[in-house]
Amino acid sequence: MNFKKLMASAMVCAFALTGCGSNTATTSEDKDTFVVGMECAYAPFNWQTSEKTDTSVKLGKSGYADGYDVQIAKKIAKKLGKKLVIKKTAWDGLIPALEGDEIDAIIAGMTKDKTR
């Protein structure tokens, strides 16, 4: 799969999932932030690193998040005029975090199936 198709697919998933949250700010952050949940363990899409790079985003006190998904999240946050916050979340915790207003979106290569 070429890079353009990959990025297009990631954008579609990201925009589709941003509408799944509520209209209120998340409980974990204020309304000036865009909180995105991802595993940070699936390179090259998203991963955790201890080193800051030109493309990484601070990941709490535990280093930095980087990857294609992080870049998509940065573009969405910029378009929304909000500060990006990446919340490292286990795969099984992503949907509950979204439904519980802990995050605003999931950007993690998640596809639709019967349970979602």
Task: Annotate each language-model stretch with its function.
Residues 1-33:
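Short, low-complexity disordered leader/linker segments with a strong preference
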